[in-house]
Amino acid sequence: MKFTKLYVPTTKEAPKDATLPSHQFLIRAGFVAQIGSGLYNFLPLGKRVLRKVENIVRDEMDKAGANEVALSFVVPGELWKQSRRYFKFGKELLRLKDRKDNDFLLAPTHEESIVDLVRDKVTSYKQLPLHLYQIGLKFRDEARPRFGLLRCREFIMKDGYSFHASEADLKREFDLMETTYTKIFSRLGLNFRAVEADSGAIGGSGSKEFMVLAKNGEDDILISDASNYAANIEAAKRAKRVCKAERPQSNSMQKFFTPGCSSIAKVTEFFKVDPFYTIKAVMKKAIYEDSEKIVVFFVRGDDELQEVKACNACSALELSDASEEEVIAAGLVPGYCGPVGLHENIDFYIDNELENEKEMICGANEKDYHAIGVNIINFNKDRFKDLAEVKAGDKALDGGVLSVTKGIEVGHIFQLGVRYSETMGATFLDENGKSKPFFMGCYGIGVSRLVAVMVEASHDEKGCIWKKECAPFMVHIIVSNIKDTEQMQFALNLESNLESSGVEVLLDDRNERFGVKMADFELIGVPFGVVVGKGLQNAEVEFIKRDGLEKVKVSSDEILGKLKEII
C-alpha cells in the first residue's frame, strides 16, 4: 500500500481532553477521528486494526462452536418492557419513537433481542445447547464519555448468548468461554487476568471480568499473593478480620452521653477503643423503578461501604447520598444511628463480618448518645450482606495477602440463569415433556475498546507500538528521497516481493522531508521499518524494530530474507 493512496491525517497536536496515550496517539496517528462526545469514526488504519481484532475473536468463537448472527441495532421498546429493563436501565438507554409513536431504543446489549430470536423456534431439549454471537454496534449514553475509545457512547462489541437445558450445562459453557477468552486475549499479546466481578445491570450470577493490567486502568483489582485469586473491587471478598487491640468490656448494653461525637474518630477517642469495635452507619437514598427510600448500611468503624455491594444488597437501581434533611425526615438521627432499636419502618443491612459480634459500640438512635455492650445477635439472616470494601493488605480467603492493581475491562462473561427466559416466556420441552425456561449465558468483548487497550499497553513517548498480530501493516518502508530513482525502485521491488509473500507493507512514497516520514513511522507504530536512503549506494539499508527503536544496517541483498524470517 502506497502512503500517497492511503488516508492518514496525522497531526502533531492531540485534543486538549486527550489525557491517555491511547487517546492521543490514535487521533494523532489518524486511526480514528472524533465527531461528537463519545463518538468516533474509524479511518483506514484504525479499520485495519479493528478487522484483525474481529478476525481473532471470530476465529476463536467459531472454534468453540458458536454461530455468528447479526441483530438489529434498533430494538423495539416492547421487548425491553417484557424483560422489565426498559425503565430500569436508566439514562444510559437511548430511547426514541418512530413516526407512529412506537417506542424503540438503540441497543446497549442484546439479551432481549436474542431471547426473542430463539423463543418459539427452539422448542425442545434436542435443539440445545445453542450459542449465538455477533460483532456489532452498541450505544450507551454515558454521562461522562472520556478516554477516547475506552469509554465512549457508541462502540463495537462481540456479544454472545448461550441457551441450555440445565444449569450444569450452562456452567460447562461458561468454563469453555473462559478458556476461549483466554485464547483470544493471549493471541492479542495482552497481559490480563480473569477476575471475579459484579454482574451489574445485566444481572445473573457467576460473573467474571477479563482485565488488562495497565497503570491507567479505571478499575481497581484485588490480587492474592497465595493463588490465582483476583477480583474487581466491587466483588472482592476477604477473610474475616481480627483485631489485637483490647475489646471494650461491658456486662450489658448501656447508653452513654457522648455530646458532639458524631464521627467514628470522635467516638473512638471518647471511649479510648480501636475503631474495629465500633459500628459505622452509612445512610443512602436507594432509587427504584417507581420509588425511593432511605436505607442504612452498617459496617465496622474502620471499614468503608462498597457502594456496588450496598446497591445489590437492597436491590436498588442506584444509590445516592442522602441529605441531612432526608435522613431526619425518615426518623433517623445523623451521627448517632445504630442497628439496635431502629424504627421498624427503616430498611437496613449489616455487614456479614458483624454477625454475632459482641460488646460493640454504636449509635443509640438518640442525639448525643451511644450504646456500648451491643451484641449483633437475633437479627434476621436476610439483614446480613457483604458490604465492606476490601482493601490492600487484607487477608485473602486463600490465606494470602491482597494487593491492589489497576486494570481495563476488555471482556465479561455471565451466567444469567433463567432471569430473561422466565420474564420473557422463553421455554422448551425437556426429555419428560415438561416446559422449562432456558438457562442462559452471556459473553461480551469490547472489540473497539481493544484497539485502544493495545496502544495503552504498548507505546512509548513517540507513538504506538503495535504487536504483529494486529498491526495495520507489518513493514513500513521509508524512502529518504523519492526523486532518487534507485531508492524508489528498490523500495518498490521490496514492497512487491513482501506482498507476494503475504506480508502487509506500507510504502511511504510521499514527497515529504525525511524527518516528517520518520516521525510518522514512530507515531503510527508499524512493527518493522526499512529506511532506503543514501546507504543504498553501499548496498545497505537501515532496519528498525519499532519496539525500542533499535536500528541496524543490513545488506540490501539480505533485507528481504531477514524480514521474512522475523515475520
Swiss-Prot record:
One of its GO terms (cellular component) is cytosol. CDD domains: ProRS-INS, ProRS_anticodon_short, ProRS_core_prok. GO terms for biological process: prolyl-tRNA aminoacylation. Gene3D superfamilies: Anticodon-binding domain (3.40.50.800), Bira Bifunctional Protein, Domain 2 (3.30.930.10). It holds the Pfam family tRNA-synt_2b. InterPro entries: aa-tRNA-synt_IIb, aa-tRNA-synth_II, aa-tRNA-synth_II/BPL/LPL, Anticodon-bd, Anticodon-bd_dom_sf, Pro-tRNA-ligase_IIa, Pro-tRNA-synth_IIa_bac-type, Pro-tRNA-Synthase_IIa_type1. Its main location: cytoplasm. It is an enzyme of class 6 (ligase). Belongs to the class-II aminoacyl-tRNA synthetase family. ProS type 1 subfamily. PANTHER family: MITOCHONDRIAL RIBOSOME PROTEIN L39/PROLYL-TRNA LIGASE FAMILY MEMBER, PROLINE--TRNA LIGASE. This is Proline--tRNA ligase. It comes from Campylobacter fetus subsp. fetus (strain 82-40).
